[in-house]
């Protein structure tokens, strides 16, 4: 201890901190998806176990309502959501090849790795969409 009023330096040893070992995290496995899905749906399935897909015509008023309801149902059920414009061949072409003709509006529910678990041709309200997601989640193997 120093005497008050002196300018002596304190003597002591410096304690060097021990370096912490680097934490190595396991690299996540890539998610394998079924081929033939639209790129937007595949991207959503990489982030979410279940994804709601809404097929809509932007020029049809009822399709806009259906799109909003499907989005709300997906949000309530904590699922991914993908709107696909039926007037854009690049977006809907892969689904048409898999499912044949799909009317608009339509709501599809997919589960990883790309399995279609629910399909609603025509209007589906938010409660119906949310319940379909909940049912699909409960049936997940």
Model-assigned labels for residue ranges:
Residues 30-31, 56-61, 82, 117-120:
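Second-shell loop/turn segments in exported
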Residues 60-64, 89, 127:
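Loop/helix-junction capping segments adjacent to catalytic residues or to phosphate/diphosphate-binding pockets
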